[in-house]
Amino acid sequence: MGYSMAKNVRQKMDSDATLYINDINASACEKFKSEFSSHGPIEIVSTAREASENSKVVISIVPGAVDVKKVYLDEKDGVIAGKPDEERVLCECSTIDVKSTREVGEALKAKGMGTYVDTPVSVSSIRCACNLILISS
């Protein structure tokens, strides 16, 4: 799901803007960059921290709450380890429990990392192909 979403984001972004991508599957990042760099710059980064420090908008989608906490709250490589930016928007698209969502959002707010938005999505391969993603917030 993340691959198709990233494809749509890269295709719709300003062609001068850089899309920073990260995935535990490095070959997926390389494939994505190869396929879509004609739409604009794509940088593969090794951590969520690196991605967020270079971005005003962060969109993440991972399998579960443990993964969300790692992306955002890991003290070395997570978003929270980076430089604060009150204007940054952090859209977390995974479907996770309310307690975890609040925990992550409160921790990020306390550190001035930006606005955390719980944005679970309803998407399928067909919807992605049609550029349709339903966002619940």
Describe each model-derived feature in a short phrase.
Residues S60-E75, S94-R102:
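Beta-loop-alpha module in the N-terminal Rossmann-like domain of NAD(P)-dependent dehydrogenases
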Residues E75-E86:
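Short, conserved loop/helix-junction motifs that constitute active-site signature segments
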Residues D16, P84-R88, K111-G114:
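A short helix->loop->beta-strand "cap" motif at the edges of active sites that frequently abuts
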Residues N8, F32-E35, G78, S100-E103, ...:
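Alpha-helical structural signal in soluble globular domains
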Residues F36-S37, K76, L132-L134:
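Short low-complexity, flexible loop/linker segments enriched in glycine and/or proline
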Residues H39-V45, K69-K70, T115-T119:
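Short gly/ser/thr-rich secondary-structure transition/capping motifs
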Residues T95-S137:
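Rossmann-fold dinucleotide-binding core
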Residues M1-S60, V89, S125-C128:
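NAD(P)+-binding Rossmann beta1-loop-alpha1 motif at the extreme N-terminus of oxidoreductases
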